[in-house]
Amino acid sequence: MISIDFINETDLKVKEWEDLAKQIINSGFKYLKLKNKINLSITFLDSEPAQKINQEYRNHSYIPDVTSFPIEMSPQEIKALGYQEIGDIFICIEEAERKSIKYDHSLKEEMGFLFTHGFLHLMGYDHETNEKDEEEMFFIQDEILKINKINYTIKFTEEDYKEIEEKDE
């Protein structure tokens, strides 16, 4: 069982994205064969607060499309609560829209990717540690997206990395 707390700090209507997030996270839960009940929050933010969070907690000055903050719990804590709190995902829809245009994806494909990517980070997967972990995370990410009939190809280029680095200087 999954419980998702949605927080909308934008002026946008997000019901469609809440429904997509539920669908993605439910399929991820099944794909990973999770046993514990889980709870997480998803907050929709505008560009400025998303950038502030990225600056404060990750020391990056660019506007992120997704930022995840996992919570680690001991088996004793999970047993006492009766569920596992896995963390918080912050989504900047404005940045997702910008990237969907830049990389020629629909906004639904982009949002599906962001929910999947954020969820996997909450579950402990990390693509920034080493190549093996990156391959594992991206394989699972692709499988969850396929289950949800979302065709998404990462199109991030070296130029994008340079652009991000320049914004951080």
UniProtKB/Swiss-Prot annotation:
Its EC number is 3.1.-.-. Pfam families: YbeY. GO terms for biological process: rRNA processing. Binds 1 zinc ion. One of its GO terms (molecular function) is zinc ion binding. GO terms for cellular component: cytoplasm. Its cofactor is Zn(2+). InterPro entries: MetalPrtase_cat_dom_sf_prd (IPR023091), YbeY (IPR002036), YbeY_CS (IPR020549). Transmembrane segments: none annotated. Zn(2+) binds at residues 117, 121, 127. It is an enzyme of class 3 (hydrolase). It is found in: Cytoplasm. Keywords: Cytoplasm, Endonuclease, Hydrolase, Metal-binding, Nuclease, Ribosome biogenesis, rRNA processing, Zinc. Belongs to the endoribonuclease YbeY family. Single strand-specific metallo-endoribonuclease involved in late-stage 70S ribosome quality control and in maturation of the 3' terminus of the 16S rRNA. This is Endoribonuclease YbeY.
